[in-house]
Swiss-Prot record:
This is Acyl-[acyl-carrier-protein] hydrolase FATB1, chloroplastic. Residues 61-78, 399-419 have a biased composition (Polar residues). The lineage of its organism: Eukaryota, Viridiplantae, Streptophyta, Embryophyta, Tracheophyta. It is an enzyme of class 3 (hydrolase). Residues 1-84, 390-419 are annotated as: Disordered. Changing E351A: Reduces thioesterase activity 18-fold. Its EC number is 3.1.2.-. Plays an essential role in chain termination during de novo fatty acid synthesis. Possesses thioesterase activity for short chain acyl-ACPs. Substrate preference is 8:0 > 10:0. It comes from Cuphea viscosissima. Its main location: plastid. It is found in: Plastid, Chloroplast. Pfam families: Acyl-ACP_TE, Acyl-ACP_TE_C, Acyl-thio_N. It catalyses: octanoyl-[ACP] + H2O = octanoate + holo-[ACP] + H(+); decanoyl-[ACP] + H2O = decanoate + holo-[ACP] + H(+). Residues 1-50 form a transit peptide.
Length: 419
């Protein structure tokens, strides 16, 4: 079809059931009727005389050659199709260029359609994101993985991914109008000197993105108990729609002056509730606290960890992402070289500042989960005060799983179904 459209511009196609009409010169089309004019022969030139034994017919027409004139008589026999002269044919290079251009344009169009068909928002919506997006309760952002965000394995580090999760949460607060004076603080929170602190984080990694990949992150809020809220994230590959990472977190209110946890005041709850989604978390929470282990039984200990100025966040305490880096400091090097982190659960117990000196302890968990190795972690101050407890799961490298999120039915705070 594409080639026919291209060639029709050069060769007009007659309508069905019609045939070309002969011109005045017999079967020749009028556009191809030959016209001969006698030319004068200059002095000294050769004069050519027609051979009397010339063939009486040429191209199906009787030809009588006389001095200076050409007469044709219509041949009653069947005539072959008219022929076109070479100088009347189109420029073949132009024709080939036109055909090539059409094919290239068609190929690009099909490529674009094929990529659009793989976009995450056109795949099966297993958690009802489309409906939540229509309600304006989901924030969606895209990030490209930079060269300085990858590690020795040429994949994005867990710290990079957590920074992107935090960035989408802050942008989500801004889009909802909750960015009053500080990161995610509502007017009621500012009035009561309240700030958000992260108390628990869960991450499950199906596959780590690599340098140059573009990922899309969807995040939304939901209520969590009486003193906080939960935040969920889905990280997917922009090109294929594959879900790479799932994460969920719990945030609590803390008084900025007393540094103690606080319940949500009524006015703050009224500000937040319209933006909550009544939906199951993307990672099921078993509500079991991480068990404490004896530091003396630890398999690996890293001491003398001290925060730097750049490790502090806007609330003047160490960023929650920095704790993850400290936890991994005590992992055995042979594990880091042969395995990759696929599951992470972190409980934040206390904050620490510039003057803190910490130690990171790691112990092997004897229990197994599908052949994956498990470890328990403890980050504490030198005086023995617990700062962070964690549990991690590791799998052999290049053994990523295609985790799927079960279909769930959710409702927004105004009662709309999002399944």
């Amino acid at each position: 079809m594409v080639a026919a459209a291209a060639t029709s511009a050069f060769f007009p196609v007659p309508a069905p059931g019609t045939s070309p009409k002969p011109g005045k010169s017999g079967n020749w089309p009028s556009s191809l009727s030959p016209t001969f004019k006698p030319k004068s022969i200059p002095n000294g030139g050769f004069q050519v005389k027609a051979n009397a034994s010339a063939h009486p017919k040429a191209n199906g027409s009787a030809v009588n050659l006389k001095s200076g004139s050409l007469n044709t008589q219509e041949d009653t026999s069947s005539s072959p199709p008219p022929r076109a002269f070479l100088n009347q044919l189109p420029d073949w290079s132009m024709l080939l260029t036109a055909i090539t251009t059409v094919f290239v344009a068609a190929e690009k169009q099909w490529t674009m359609l094929d990529r659009k068909s793989k976009r995450p928002d056109m795949l099966v919506d297993s958690v009802g994101l489309k409906s939540i997006v229509r309600d304006g309760l989901v924030s969606r952002h895209s990030f490209s993985i930079r060269s300085y965000e990858i590690g020795a394995d040429r994949t994005a580090s867990i710290e990079t991914l957590m920074n992107h999760l935090q960035e989408t949460t802050i942008n989500h607060c801004k889009s909802l109008g909750l960015h009053n004076d500080g990161f995610g603080r509502t007017p009621g929170m500012c009035k009561n000197d309240l700030i958000w602190v992260l108390t628990k984080m869960q991450i499950m990694v199906n596959r780590y993105p690599t340098w140059g990949d573009t990922v899309e992150i969807n995040t939304w809020f939901s209520q969590s108990g009486k003193i906080g809220m939960a935040s969920d994230w889905l990280i997917s590959d922009c090109n294929t729609g594959e879900i790479l990472i799932r994460a969920t977190s719990v945030w609590a209110m803390m008084n900025q002056k007393t540094r103690r946890f606080s319940r949500l005041p009524y006015e703050v709850r009224q500000e937040l509730t319209p933006h909550f989604v009544d939906s199951p978390h993307v990672i099921e929470d078993n509500d079991q606290k991480l068990r404490k282990f004896d530091v003396k039984t630890g398999d690996s200990i890293r001491k003398g960890l001290t925060p730097r100025w750049n490790d502090l966040d806007v609330n003047q305490h160490v960023s929650n992402v920095k704790y993850i880096g400290w936890i991994l400091e005590s992992m055995p090097i042979e594990v880091l070289e042969t395995q990759e982190l696929c599951s992470l659960t972190v409980e934040y117990r206390r904050e620490c500042g510039m003057d803190s000196v910490l130690e990171s302890v790691t112990a092997v968990d004897p229990s197994e989960n599908g052949g994956r190795s498990q470890y328990k972690h403890l980050l504490r101050l030198e005086d023995g005060t617990d700062i962070v407890k964690s549990r991690t799961e590791w799998r052999p490298k290049n053994a990523g799983t295609n985790g799927a999120i079960s279909t769930s039915t959710a409702k927004t705070s105004n009662g709309n179904s999002v399944s």
